[in-house]
UniProtKB/Swiss-Prot annotation:
EC number(s) per entry: 1.-.-.-
Species assigned in the record: Schizosaccharomyces pombe (strain 972 / ATCC 24843) (Fission yeast)
Domain of life: Eukaryota
Function: Putative oxidoreductase that negatively regulates the retrieval of cargo from late endosomes to the Golgi.
Major localization listed first in the record, in broad terms: cytoplasm
Name by which UniProt lists this protein: Putative oxidoreductase C6G10.06
Compartments where located: Cytoplasm; Membrane
Lipid bilayer topology: Single-pass membrane protein
One GO term (biological process): retrograde transport, endosome to Golgi
Protein family membership: Belongs to the TDA3 family.
Residues passing through the membrane, by range: 11-31
Induction details: Expression shows a peak that coincides with the meiotic divisions.
Example GO molecular function: oxidoreductase activity
Keywords: Cytoplasm, Membrane, Oxidoreductase, Transmembrane, Transmembrane helix, Transport
Length: 376
């Protein structure tokens, strides 16, 4: 079959990347009449596993706050879509969807002015607390388990007929996706023909399409249990000054999970990204540094148990600093570069990208700010 023919009048859409944006795009394609009429075939190409990259974190925030005016409409739409998905598929049960309180805490090693700490944050070191203030209201922040979300939605779209192809994608073009099937020799190369190609491969987008400027911010993560203190549904941005009077602060974001566990996220740094996600090597001292900070932040009465440590790559655009939701000059669609906001903005990105793939005159929000003159 030629790349431009229509087998049974079906349009083949190939999506590179089985993370949250690729999954959401496929889902919203299946919601369109063209799919329900049997006019589309959708294929997701994934190298390792569903949500195997940055979408595989156990807890993440959803909010439209703390963002610039360019990307805020994307988050506003996404939050409405998350609410709809929660009602339709019982997100509270299936991906731990819940509202959360958010706090900013400033702590100091040699603190002399102790601030009041809310009852829900008694697991923090009170003696070092200089400032503790709420961010927004209870309705401004929500949380989900992105990995569970992706796995649930992947099963849902598979029921609807979306096909998953596991293998390492080597090259993409408007009408072809070249890949090596999983667990096959490197010289086992398959060139799949499609009519439209979307690359939503997170930080690995930059390897397939270097001109996009997509790179990976590496973030260390530590997972702890604190069974003797109920942590509630809380998000804490904590700034700790360990250098006396110097204005040098180390920052960590803390997310609660299952009301008895905490996830500490360190400072993102640009890191050499391997071409294969299975070959990621990291500096263990970054985990040690984050663990030292957790020891200083947690109350001495908090009985914490170390559960796990990991690193995740956040895809970011080094050209604009905002997401790319666009097509290249050669006709390849791109959705990547959301950095910290990829989980929040995924449903809106997926919906708009589905509309673009189907050639709609207008998308659900104005995506012009996310268009770039990409490629050759």
């Amino acid at each position: 079959m030629s790349a431009t023919s229509r087998e049974g009048n079906k349009t083949k859409i190939g999506i590179v990347g089985g993370g949250i944006i690729g999954i959401c795009t496929a889902f919203y394609l299946t919601e369109e009449q063209e799919y329900k009429k049997g006019e589309l075939d959708i294929f997701i190409f994934e190298s390792k596993e569903i949500a195997g990259g940055s979408s595989g974190i156990d807890s993440a925030i959803l909010t439209k706050l703390c963002q610039n005016e360019i990307i805020q409409p994307l988050s506003t739409l996404a939050l409405k879509l998350y609410e709809g998905l929660d009602k339709k598929f019982d997100g509270k049960k299936n991906w731990e969807y819940r509202t959360a309180n958010s706090w900013f805490c400033k702590m100091k090693w040699d603190n002399t002015n102790v601030a009041k700490v809310p009852d829900t944050l008694q697991w923090l070191q009170r003696e070092r607390m200089q400032k503790c203030s709420s961010i927004g209201s209870g309705n401004d922040f929500a949380m989900i388990n992105p990995k569970l979300f992706c796995q649930f939605m992947a099963k849902e779209i598979e029921k609807r007929g979306v096909k998953f192809i596991f293998g390492s994608v080597k090259e993409v073009s408007k009408h072809h996706i070249t890949y090596v099937p999983k667990q096959e020799a490197e010289d086992t190369i398959i060139k799949a023909q499609v009519h439209k190609t979307l690359v939503s491969a997170g930080p690995w987008t930059g390897y397939l399409l270097p001109f996009t400027g997509i790179a990976g911010l590496c973030i260390p993560i530590i997972h702890l249990s604190v069974g003797n203190f109920p942590v509630g549904d809380s998000i804490v941005v904590c700034c700790l000054n360990t250098m006396g009077n110097l204005n040098i602060c180390k920052t960590t974001e803390i997310f609660s999970k299952n009301r008895e566990q905490l996830i500490f996220m360190g400072t993102p740094k640009f890191h050499l990204l391997p071409k294969d996600s299975n070959r990621c090597f990291f500096n263990p001292f970054e985990i040690i540094e984050l663990k030292e900070m957790t020891d200083l932040v947690l109350s001495e009465n908090t009985k914490s148990n170390y559960l796990d440590a990991s690193f995740k790559f956040l895809p970011t655009s080094r050209i604009t600093g905002i997401p790319i939701i666009s097509t290249t000059k050669s006709g390849v669609f791109v959705a990547a570069g959301h950095a910290n906001w990829g989980i929040t903005q995924a449903p809106a990105t997926g919906l708009c990208m589905a509309e673009m793939l189907l050639g709609k005159e207008k998308t659900s929000i104005n995506t012009d700010p996310f268009h770039l003159n990409l490629g050759e």
